[in-house]
């Protein structure tokens, strides 16, 4: 049986691109997300992509995923489910949004890692890939809930690497900078397409979801003794979180 790669948040964007790429490179992909219609479209593309409708904020759903994978060669878990849900200052923000952001990004990853790491240990090898963000390396205005959550995921990856020392399980954190996907900015701005478009305005070549998928593929296909602790990837136009070269229209 082919080695299994489980990818969360796989109905669109980075998750869907990663599912396609790993399926092309010899993995049996179990793609999980909440939106069944999107998952059905994904599984129709490749017989090596299996899908399950799973909400990572649900203990019951994640246990269902673990039960489905019992006795199977689970080697890769890509914790990609996440998102930003506001662009408010700390003072004007809604604490419920902070709770949601932390649950989806951090606790959702914890649930999946707790459920699937024992399967990797039993199989004899595994690789946990946590998709964070450059927002986990710095702070910026109006991004408190997301910045806090991504810092939490960075801490999660570093802690896991220490706690799993001695086991044949790799832990990699991949921190993308500016990635232009169909949904991230739209979700952050509650569907306001004009505000979302301004994020990428004038940036000649932001990263794409396929670029991040390639970084994930590269890291998981390295020799098994080789661990990438963390990887930061940005478009050339983004020198730092706050420094983005934009081409202005004349």
List the model feature ranges, each with a label:
Residues 11-12:
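Conserved glycine-rich cofactor-binding loop
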Residues 25-40:
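Conserved glycine-rich Rossmann-like NAD(P)H-binding loop of the short-chain dehydrogenase/reductase
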Residues 88-90, 94-99:
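Substrate-binding pocket helix/loop in short-chain dehydrogenase/reductase
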Residues 113, 149:
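Active-site helix of classical SDR
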Residues 118, 162-165:
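Alpha-helical segment proximal to the catalytic Tyr-Lys
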Residues 133:
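Residue(s) in the substrate-gating loop at a strand-loop-helix junction
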Residues 173-174, 193-242:
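C-terminal helical subdomain
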